[in-house]
Amino acid sequence: MDLPAPIHDILLVSLGSGLIVGGLGVVLLTNPIYSAFSLGLVLVCISLFYIPSNSYFVAAAQLLIYVGAINVLILFAVMFMNGSEYYNYFHFWTVGDGFTSLVCTSIFFSLIATIPNTSWYGIIWTTRSNQIIEQDLTSNVQQIGIHLSTDFYLPFELISIILLVSLVGAIAMARRE
């Protein structure tokens, strides 16, 4: 999407703030339904990040798969859970919670200190991407596959990490019962 620079910056800042607010909502809200809705906000913001980079198909696929299917499945699972038993196990600030919050805040502040000082323009993400893209790709599916494995590799890896963490959290909640 060819947007003027100020509008593009405002869009990215608003999507980034939506990601931060949604992520904090997932972690800090005690009601699991509100946490699932916050996860939906995070997934919507991630899918909307693809629109300024002219990847409309990827954005639509993210919305359909992650928000439309996975988040609805998480909401159904949370709603079928017995809420009263869940809150009996909930204690404020155990030793593990304190240690986890200390580790997470240290990682957060180290990333804040590292990211602005890193020169991202000299990094070569893949070595063969230019050779592959120079070939005559006739099919849109081939072009999407090449872009997903080269240009958009990092966002899909981040989504897989988010899904892995949510799966581990669901298993940990299920093992308590």
From Swiss-Prot:
Keywords: Chloroplast, Membrane, NAD, NADP, Plastid, Plastoquinone, Quinone, Thylakoid, Translocase, Transmembrane, Transmembrane helix, Transport
Membrane topology recorded in Swiss-Prot or TrEMBL: Multi-pass membrane protein
Keyword Plastid: yes
A molecular-function term among this protein's GO annotations: quinone binding
EC number per UniProt: 7.1.1.-
Name of a matching Pfam family: Oxidored_q3
The protein's role, per its UniProt record: NDH shuttles electrons from NAD(P)H:plastoquinone, via FMN and iron-sulfur (Fe-S) centers, to quinones in the photosynthetic chain and possibly in a chloroplast respiratory chain. The immediate electron acceptor for the enzyme in this species is believed to be plastoquinone. Couples the redox reaction to proton translocation, and thus conserves the redox energy in a proton gradient.
Family stated for the protein in its record: Belongs to the complex I subunit 6 family.
Protein name: NAD(P)H-quinone oxidoreductase subunit 6, chloroplastic
Species: Nymphaea alba
